[in-house]
Structures are given as structure tokens and as C-alpha cells.
């Protein structure tokens, strides 16, 4: 074959003409100008994004979030972990409804009662001391004394007491003395019962005869959930839950190990 000449191959027949669909051209208004935005650093104003992750939160919010994460990451001993097992909502509602009937009197109510008594005494009608009505007893020291003397019928402890050391001994003491106890969500709810912002623990000492049946039912349910399960609760550790980054890192290492083992085995 002489140099410079190209070999002629067979020409492929052209494809049959495909009828092209004619697209309707969009009518563009020349008055509308395209002005694309540049979201680079120092350029256009950034679009609205969810920046929750980058917010500098107040100190108390940071602390409570860090505390919650620490409780998940670290191994939590059973004595502290038992405070995560709060009473179910239905039983807690019934308990609070009953406790609401036995709220102690406010300062204003006490003042009015004493004033009425003083007026009666001044009028010469005689001073007859009234019997103290059954009310809730609040506070760690008061409740501890009542439990030790076996005068408490039911003890209610808040789950979020800070520092937790204030009430960490109470469940063990209640079980030892045979007093039914329960852990309820919210120290503020207990505080509301006794006209304070928060309250660590409250106790029932006496109730009126019409409420004895309701209290007995509650005590039975609470005893089953807490006092009778004490040995099980005592063995149950909490926390030790890794975060998503750690889980992903461990999974990656495991995957690499499995791959290496597979190549060795062939």
C-alpha cells in the first residue's frame, strides 16, 4: 500500500431521519435581567439557614445539655441510675390529684385563720384549739425523720434533684423501713404542691377516710413498681451509650478488620 493514501472503508448508511419535536421557545422578557448570586465569602448576603448548631447558648443551657450527654456516655452506678425510672404518667397524674387535696396552707390562709381565731377570742367566745388537718410533709430532713419513725405512708421523690446526693439514700432507707416510695418527674411539680418553686421530696402521713381507698390503690401499684423490684433496680447500671461519631469510627475499624481477615483467608 503506497504511502500517504488512506484506506477507504465502507461507508455506514446514515440513520433514518428522526422527526424532531419542535420545542416551543420560551418568550423571555428582555426587561428581566439575570442576576445570579454569589454566596462566596464576603460576597452576597447568605440565605436563611438553620444555624442552631452554631448558636452560643446561655451557660445554664450548655450545662444541662452537657450533663445529659455525660449521663449517656459515662457508666452511671445503679444508685443514681434508679432516678431515670420515673412513675408512669397515668399513675403520676392520679398521685398528684390526690396530693393536691392535701396541700399545706399558704401564708395568707394562715394569717386569716389566726386573725379569725383572735377575733373570736377578743369577742369572749373562748379559744378552742382546732385539730391540725392532714397535710403533705415536705423536705428531705422532715421526710427522713418520718420514714425512720415509720410515720410516712407514701414517699414521693423528684427525679431531677441537683445535687442528687441530697436524696440518693432515700430509696434504700424507705425499703429498709418498709415504706412505699416512688420517683416522679419534676421537682417543680412537687414544689407547686407545697407553694415553693421546687421541692426534693414529699410524704403522705395521714389522709381523710374518703381518700384511704385511693391511697391504698396507689400504694399497691407503687410498691409493685419500686419496693418489690429493688433488687433488680440495684443491679441495673446506666449510661455507656456511645455517640454517633464514636459508633461510626468503631464500625469503620471493624469493617477494615473484617476486610483484612477476608484477604488473609483468601
Curated annotation (Swiss-Prot):
| Biological-process GO terms, alphabetical | cytoplasmic translation; ribosome biogenesis; translation at postsynapse; translation at presynapse
Q: Which residues carry this modification: N6-acetyllysine?
A: 34, 97, 217
Gene name on record? Rpl7a
State the function annotated in the UniProt record: Component of the large ribosomal subunit. The ribosome is a large ribonucleoprotein complex responsible for the synthesis of proteins in the cell.
Name of the protein in its database record = Large ribosomal subunit protein eL8
Its domain of life? Eukaryota
Q: Does the keyword Ribonucleoprotein apply?
A: yes
Keywords of the record: Acetylation, Cytoplasm, Isopeptide bond, Ribonucleoprotein, Ribosomal protein, Ubl conjugation
Compartment list: Cytoplasm
Amino acid at each position: 500500500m503506497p504511502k500517504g493514501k488512506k484506506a477507504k472503508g465502507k461507508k455506514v448508511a446514515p440513520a433514518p431521519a428522526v422527526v424532531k419535536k419542535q420545542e416551543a421557545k420560551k418568550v423571555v422578557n428582555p426587561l428581566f435581567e439575570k442576576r445570579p448570586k454569589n454566596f462566596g465569602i464576603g460576597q452576597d448576603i447568605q440565605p436563611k439557614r438553620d444555624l442552631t448548631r452554631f448558636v452560643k447558648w446561655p451557660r445554664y443551657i450548655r450545662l444541662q445539655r452537657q450533663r445529659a450527654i455525660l449521663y449517656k456516655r459515662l457508666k452511671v452506678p445503679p444508685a443514681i441510675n434508679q432516678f431515670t425510672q420515673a412513675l408512669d404518667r397515668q399513675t403520676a397524674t392520679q398521685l398528684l390529684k390526690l396530693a393536691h387535696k392535701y396541700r399545706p396552707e399558704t401564708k395568707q390562709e394562715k394569717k386569716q385563720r389566726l386573725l379569725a381565731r383572735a377575733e373570736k377570742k377578743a369577742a369572749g367566745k373562748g379559744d378552742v384549739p382546732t385539730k391540725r388537718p392532714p397535710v403533705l410533709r415536705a423536705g428531705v430532713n422532715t421526710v427522713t425523720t418520718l420514714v425512720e419513725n415509720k410515720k410516712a405512708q407514701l414517699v414521693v421523690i423528684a427525679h431531677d434533684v441537683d445535687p442528687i446526693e441530697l436524696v440518693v439514700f432515700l430509696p434504700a432507707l424507705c425499703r429498709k423501713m418498709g415504706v412505699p416510695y416512688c420517683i416522679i418527674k419534676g421537682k417543680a411539680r412537687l414544689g407547686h404542691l407545697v407553694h415553693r418553686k421546687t421541692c426534693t421530696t414529699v410524704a403522705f402521713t395521714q389522709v381523710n377516710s374518703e381518700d384511704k381507698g385511693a391511697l391504698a390503690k396507689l400504694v399497691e401499684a407503687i410498691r409493685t413498681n419500686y419496693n418489690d423490684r429493688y433488687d433488680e433496680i440495684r443491679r441495673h447500671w446506666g449510661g455507656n451509650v456511645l455517640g454517633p461519631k464514636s459508633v461510626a469510627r468503631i464500625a469503620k475499624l471493624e469493617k477494615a478488620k473484617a476486610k483484612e481477615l477476608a484477604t488473609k483467608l483468601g
